[in-house]
Amino acid sequence: LPERRMQLLSGMEEGDLFTLKSVAHQLKGAGGGYGYPGLTERAQQLEMACRAEKHAEIPGTLKNLVSYIDQICR
């Protein structure tokens, strides 16, 4: 998860929607498999915002996802 977190932050910094969408998609699948439905939900929200190119929603959904990852990794 720490590596995925860094990829998300780098993608945001670079404005790389493809990376954000791809990493969110990977996390969406992994969350359910490892028993973290909250991770799946937040990753899906980010993936959907990226797919729809809803630029105003992306920072907030990314922040929610990164905060959740931080909670898991504590």
Regions found by a protein language model. Name each.
Residues 3-19:
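Helix-loop segments that flank and shape redox-cofactor active sites
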Residues 22:
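Conserved alpha-helix in the HATPase_c
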Residues 2-5, 30-74:
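Amphipathic, coiled-coil-like alpha-helical segments
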